Amino acid sequence: MPLAKAFEKKYGVKVELWRALSDKVVQRAVTEAQAKRHAVDVVETNGPELEMLTREKLTSEFYSPYIADLPAFALPPHRQWVSDRMNFFVVGYNTSKVRREELPATYEGFLDPRWKGRLGIEATDAEWMATLIKVWGVERGMNFFRKLSEMKPDVRKGHILLAELVAAGEIHVGLTTYNSNAESMKRRGGPIDWAPVEPVVARPQGIAVMKNAPHPNAALLFADFVLSPEGQELFSSLGRVPASLKVASTLNNFKYTLVDPATVLDESEKWEKIWNELFLKK
């Protein structure tokens, strides 16, 4: 991970990195805490998952001089984690299979029969569905998702995997692609691009220092580095969207609806039940 390598080079502090899907990150942190094994210093993952760790009382109150550079939404009232970057749910498409001008202006355009057998979604994106329904209203929103279910999109777990399958041409269009994943693959020469089809849903990603971090000073130093202009510029260079207002990005110049991680968590049972019925129990 370039961010970890840059930190090691600057401070001479060795970083041991473990990467996994967000649910696995939470599972490991909770399991180890229950076993009184405190091996994790810092967690960087999705906002709702950080909210889960906060409610499990595994994180510590967060302070950094770089919080002043962040938008108001980046720091929850409890200060147990802070947003360091953003993820946007966009339409990723294989440039060998789909021309940009073919893409509809809104998600409802993908209900056209010509897209059947060409669409993919990520298996855990109930919050994307919930946000579209809130934006559109229940009747219009549920009508869309029932019809989308009938299109039988290819459901895959993992946003990186979804983007990889789009780039490989196995899935022509990923409806819930993270623009950061598509952008990084595009910059490496992959046949993939993305478009902010409305309505675009945005979710904060964040970083938390664990309450029982075995190396608390190094953990705080790493968190500061991630939030610093240097760390945020590095995010930007990798095709990520930094949270800092001091670092410009060309990857968020469109209208979007921001989800609140605490609300996502509070309503997760309701929306996941609907999502599972529509897309996972097939």
Each language-model region and where it sits:
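Extracytoplasmic ligand-binding site segments that recognize negatively charged/polar headgroups
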Residues: 1-4, 16-26, 30, 38-170
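The catalytic Nudix box helix
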Residues: 1-13, 253
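Short amphipathic alpha-helical coupling segments at ligand-binding clamshell hinges
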Residues: 3, 13, 140, 144-147, ...
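A ligand-binding cleft/hinge motif common to bilobed small-molecule-binding domains
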Residues: 49-52, 172-192
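Periplasmic-binding protein-like
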Residues: 69-73, 87, 115-124, 146-149, 153-156, 226-247, ...
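A bilobed periplasmic-binding-protein/Venus flytrap-type ligand-binding module shared by bacterial periplasmic
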Residues: 90-97, 133-135, 204-218, 234
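Extracellular/periplasmic bilobal clamshell ligand-binding domains
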Residues: 249-282
